[in-house]
Amino acid sequence: MSDIAERVKKIVIDHLGVDADKVVEGASFIDDLGADSLDTVELVMAFEEEFGVEIPDDAADSILTVGDAVKFIEKAQA
């Protein structure tokens, strides 16, 4: 797992209070990890702060899984 993926995983665990073994690449924030719409907004804000990237609203709407977040951040930092 990349450094970015590890950091994303830690943010998700801290914000949603879920078990680490549930935070896998294909895990949906809402369907698998129990997030609501406010949680997803807070996660996006936490990703922006942690990684120093801006995630526009249209991009944020397409970040539905842990893997989506990692891919977006990797691309934004490239």
Swiss-Prot record:
The modification O-(pantetheine 4'-phosphoryl)serine is found at S37. Pathway: Lipid metabolism; fatty acid biosynthesis. GO terms for cellular component: cytosol; membrane. GO terms for biological process: lipid A biosynthetic process. Residues 2-77 form the Carrier domain. GO terms for molecular function: acyl binding; acyl carrier activity; phosphopantetheine binding. The keyword Cytoplasm applies. 4'-phosphopantetheine is transferred from CoA to a specific serine of apo-ACP by AcpS. This modification is essential for activity because fatty acids are bound in thioester linkage to the sulfhydryl of the prosthetic group. Its main location: cytoplasm. Keywords: Cytoplasm, Fatty acid biosynthesis, Fatty acid metabolism, Lipid biosynthesis, Lipid metabolism, Phosphopantetheine, Phosphoprotein. The keyword Lipid metabolism applies. It is found in: Cytoplasm. InterPro entries: ACP, ACP-like_sf, PKS_PP-bd, PP-bd_ACP, Ppantetheine_attach_site. PROSITE patterns: CARRIER (PS50075), PHOSPHOPANTETHEINE (PS00012). Belongs to the acyl carrier protein (ACP) family. Carrier of the growing fatty acid chain in fatty acid biosynthesis. HAMAP family: Acyl_carrier. This is Acyl carrier protein AcpP. It comes from Agrobacterium fabrum (strain C58 / ATCC 33970) (Agrobacterium tumefaciens (strain C58)).
